């Protein structure tokens, strides 16, 4: 499930999928994570920022940032267990 590790971040590319798939993939990935891991989600879903803010709040993770890289949205959060 882990796509790649880049700059000590675990990259999850969900480009081309829409709600709820990006968060569902992140939940599946969470089973493989350890405390303190930084996850970088790459998505094209315009609703993903709000979805991940809610997911992080619900799960006790730290939502770090979101920004655009061209047409893709980058979302970063810190996993806590």
Where are these regions (language model features)?
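Intrinsic-disorder/low-complexity, polar/charged segments enriched in Ser/Thr/Lys/Arg/Asp/Glu/Gln
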Residues: 9, 36-40, 72-74
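Amphipathic, hydrophobic secondary-structure cores in small proteins
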Residues: 20, 25-62
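C-terminal structural segments of small proteins and small subunits
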Residues: 53-81
């Amino acid at each position: 499930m882990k796509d790649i590790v880049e700059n000590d971040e675990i990259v999850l590319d969900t480009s081309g999928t829409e709600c709820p798939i990006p968060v569902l993939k992140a939940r599946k990935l969470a089973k493989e994570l350890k405390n303190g891991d930084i996850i970088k989600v790459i998505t094209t879903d315009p609703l993903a920022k709000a979805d991940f803010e809610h997911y992080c709040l619900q799960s006790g993770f730290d939502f770090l940032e979101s920004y655009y890289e061209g047409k893709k949205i980058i979302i970063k959060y810190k996993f806590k267990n």
